[in-house]
């Protein structure tokens, strides 16, 4: 597979995948875990809290690569240190991928808050996965309004993603998942 995208493919990825949405205050911030870009994820969540963009949060992410603390524990710890009240952050400690982030978090959200009480969600995760976060959430929770905030843990700015080998590889890997995941029913079109 050639990882050097054409100009047309770059334009399509920029328009369809590496997106952000206008923000408004939401009932819930859904933080998709990961080990790469933790500091940026925490900073974005704290910034959203300080600007009063969410009332509750859920952090989802399990253990990775033999590290004792889960992604959830690491990210939540950083959010609390940054000033987000611990009791407003729900926890999901088992997920190992985006689909599990959603599937394992929904019962936690339902038990703590009642899904019927949530009308809007901000998805927070890495830019390389971008649109796939709300597409996955939309597949399993279509009723809520979804917004997207992404962090960029790479050395290149987002508009130059295709010039950085690591950034390009991750974007292309995530971009190539969309159609097979759509066919398998893991995600659905959004918006």
Regions found by a protein language model. Give the residues of each.
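A structural signal for short, hydrophobic/glycine-enriched beta-strand patches
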Residues: 1-171
């Amino acid at each position: 597979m050639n990882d050097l995208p054409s100009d047309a493919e770059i334009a399509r990825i920029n328009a369809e995948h590496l997106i952000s949405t206008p923000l408004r205050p939401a009932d819930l911030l859904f933080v998709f875990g990961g080990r790469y870009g933790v500091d940026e994820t925490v900073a974005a969540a704290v910034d959203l809290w300080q600007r009063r963009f969410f009332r509750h949060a859920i952090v989802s992410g399990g253990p990775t690569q033999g590290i004792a603390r889960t992604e959830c524990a690491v990210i939540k710890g950083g959010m609390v240190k940054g000033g987000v009240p611990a009791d407003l952050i729900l926890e999901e400690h088992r997920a190992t991928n985006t689909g599990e982030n959603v599937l394992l978090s929904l019962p936690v959200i339902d038990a703590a808050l009642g899904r019927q009480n949530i009308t809007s969600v901000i998805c927070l995760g890495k830019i390389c996965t971008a649109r796939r976060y709300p597409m996955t959430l939309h597949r399993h929770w279509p009723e809520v309004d979804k917004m997207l905030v992404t962090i960029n843990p790479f050395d290149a700015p987002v508009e130059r993603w295709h010039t950085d080998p690591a950034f390009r590889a991750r974007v292309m890997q995530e971009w190539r998942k969309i159609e097979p995941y759509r066919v398998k029913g893991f995600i659905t079109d959004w918006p």
